[in-house]
Regions:
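Divalent metal-dependent catalytic cores for phosphoryl transfer on phosphate-bearing substrates
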Residues: 128
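P-loop (Walker A) phosphate-binding loop of NTP-binding proteins
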Residues: 97, 124
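Conserved RecA-like ASCE P-loop NTPase motor core of nucleic-acid helicases/translocases
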Residues: 119-123
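Peripheral, non-AAA+ core regions of ATP-driven protein-machinery
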Residues: 2-12, 16-80, 87-93, 100-110, ...
């Protein structure tokens, strides 16, 4: 006989406590501890195996290396982020803001997957008629797609066991409920238990399962943090509502590389792949304008060029204002301090703004030099050449430090018509002779050297 006990669980991080806290000891958030009733098995009750059959032990040397079989989604950018396709028996979590396109990309993938595989689409948010309307708009006409409007996890798991579909899509995990848990749908306990059941089902029958997840106000997957540890792959769908572009980013992948991205454009017909993101990021760049510089960052194995815009104006307040969009604010403040101390460019009476065009977020330190160039270009009202690109990490001593994949970055710049590349001095030796002949490559050691190497006109 199961006993009932109450626990207070944080809705943000999943921290559990026997008493209520105003501030969660785990994540520090306020008013996130919610009371939930848990079922606990009484002492002496035989613990079930959870549906797992005991298996004989195997030595590592006895295990054969089977080539993993991947299933292509038919969307090249999607396959890139997944590591080459869908792995059998994997559990993939896809998160993103409401209306960003999570359900859209999965439904579009069903059109190609349905040519050779059967797909079960489980919806807890929409009716079958609503899904049909959206499928018609996206041009999804496959007969291998089956719709199930259900939220009970036990019923869904039984359907998977009996029907044996090749691929399962759960939309969304926050609407699923497990009848052995008394809390409401979307609670920490419900999300955790439902995910465990889907993981068990995926591994037992070798069926890949996609799980759609909502995000909280901070942009993280809503529910316990352990949710991301349970699944095999975590994908984030990012994008600003004011932009038509969407970025699919992989942050965890047990079967491929992480930090890969796929770029899409949202249209009336659905999501379209952007095969050349660099060209898209640089489209519409102003001519002969100060305060703009092109950066080259690595997103996984792909070099991407992005325009960084800086604006420096006289402040109207006692304390200068700093604002950054698409670039870390604290790192921007550090770069301004380095420019003042090491290069003699003073911003103490100036407001400074940084914007990365097209909604891209630059997390790599290699973007430091481009951000610094954009700020100084605006400060001095000097125009950086249209065909000039710069990348490199800036240290606190004002030095330009080496970055990885330098040759790939320079090759991408040359392919898009750039003529001059300002790069870290320590990366220059690793470049091939052909690249050095094709492009005007300027190696620099310090911030001062970088600005003196620029061709600018005031």
């Amino acid at each position: 006989m199961a006993k009932q006990r109450s626990m207070y669980i944080c809705s943000e991080c999943g921290y559990e406590s026997g008493k209520w806290y105003g501030k969660c000891p785990g994540c520090g958030e306020w008013n996130t501890m919610n009371e939930e009733t848990l079922a606990v098995k009484s002492t002496g009750t035989k613990r079930s195996s959870g549906g797992y059959a005991s298996r004989p032990l195997k030595r590592l040397s006895e295990i054969t290396e089977d080539v993993e079989r991947r299933i292509s989604t038919g969307i090249h950018e999607f396959d890139r982020v997944l590591g080459g396709g869908i792995v059998e028996g994997s559990l993939v979590l896809l998160g993103g803001d409401p209306g960003i396109g999570k359900s859209t990309i999965l439904l579009q993938a069903c059109q190609h997957l349905g040519q050779h595989h059967t797909i079960l689409y489980v919806s807890g948010e929409e009716s079958a008629n609503q899904i049909k309307l959206r499928a018609n708009r996206l041009g999804v006409t496959t007969d291998s797609l089956y719709i199930l409007a259900e939220t009970d996890v036990g019923s869904i798991a039984e359907t998977i066991r009996s029907e044996k579909p090749d691929i399962v899509i759960i939309d969304s995990i926050q609407t699923m409920v497990y009848d052995q848990v008394t809390s409401s749908a979307g609670s920490v306990t419900q999300v955790r238990e439902c995910t465990n059941i889907f993981m068990h089902t995926a591994k037992t029958y070798g069926i890949p399962i996609f799980v759609v997840g909502h995000v909280n106000k901070d942009g993280a997957i809503a529910g316990p943090k352990v949710l991301e540890h349970i699944v095999d792959t975590v994908l984030y769908f990012e994008g600003e509502r004011n932009y038509s572009y969407r970025i699919l980013r992989g942050v965890k992948n047990r079967f491929g590389s992480t930090n890969e991205i796929g770029v899409f454009e949202m249209t009336q017909e659905g999501l379209l792949e952007v095969e050349n993101p660099s060209l898209m990021m640089l489209s519409g760049r102003p001519k002969n304008a100060s305060g703009t510089c092109v950066a080259c960052v690595m997103e996984g194995s792909r070099p991407i060029l992005a325009e960084v815009q800086g604006l420096v104006t006289a402040t109207g307040f006692g304390t200068p204002r700093r604002m950054s969009t698409g670039f870390d604010f604290n790192r921007m403040a550090m770069l301004i301090a380095v420019l003042e101390k090491r290069a003699g460019f003073f911003f103490n009476t100036m407001d400074a703004y940084i914007n990365v065009v097209s909604g891209l977020r630059l997390d790599e330190p290699a973007a430091d030099l481009s951000v610094a160039m954009a700020l100084v270009s605006s400060l001095k009202d000097a125009v950086i050449g249209d065909k000039v690109l710069a990348f490199g990490e800036i240290g606190l001593a004002g030095e330009i430090r080496a970055v990885s994949h330098c040759e790939q970055r320079v090759q991408e710049a040359g392919r898009l018509g750039f003529q001059r590349c300002v790069i870290p001095f320590h990366n220059y030796k690793s470049l091939s002779r052909d690249l050095k002949k094709e492009l005007d490559i300027v190696p620099v050691r310090t911030v001062r050297d970088a600005f003196s190497a620029l061709t600018v006109k005031e």
